[in-house]
Regions:
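Bacterial N-terminal signal peptides that target proteins for export
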Residues: 2-11
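Bacterial N-terminal signal peptides
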Residues: 11-20
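General secretory precursor processing signal
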Residues: 21-23, 60, 83-84, 124
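Short, non-transmembrane alpha-helical segments in secretory-pathway proteins
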Residues: 25-58
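Exposed beta-strand-loop-beta-strand "reactive/processing" segments of non-cytosolic proteins
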Residues: 53-98
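C-terminal partner/receptor-binding element of secreted or periplasmic proteins
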Residues: 101-125
Length: 125
């Protein structure tokens, strides 16, 4: 009986380790980070974005630290008929390099989720 119990514990432990490794998807480049952000913006229909064609009025500005990519999503007014010298920031994302997890400060996302937004970054997928 003890042998079976130990075997079950070992299988459970191994499964948990495998699950953690599968979920850990390192992000190695700015391009990978932007692709994750685009996928998330489309998935959550932020600013009415339903597909990549809807992103023509957006521009992505990227800062990199040792742990993460910080991506500002801005309105590209020149492409959309506005003042070419103005690109207001709409919202930002943080992409964790080690895990690939995302967080955003999008007010629209918080509102859709019914969260009383205080300006902080919220986890998003």
């Amino acid at each position: 009986m003890r042998k079976i119990f130990n075997k079950k514990i070992a299988i459970l432990f191994f499964s948990l380790i495998c699950a953690c490794l599968v979920n850990a998807a390192p992000v190695k480049s700015e391009n990978e980070a932007v692709k994750l952000v685009i996928k998330s913006v489309i998935k959550h229909n932020i600013y009415g974005v339903k597909n990549e064609n809807d992103l023509k009025c957006f521009r992505f500005y990227i800062d990199e630290t040792a742990e993460e990519f910080e991506i500002d999503v801005r309105s590209n007014n020149e492409k959309c008929g506005g003042d070419p010298n103005v690109e207001p920031r709409l919202f930002s994302y943080i992409v964790n390099k080690k895990t690939g997890k995302l967080a955003t400060d999008s007010f629209e996302y918080a509102k859709k989720k019914g969260i009383d937004w205080d300006g902080s970054y919220l986890p998003i997928d």
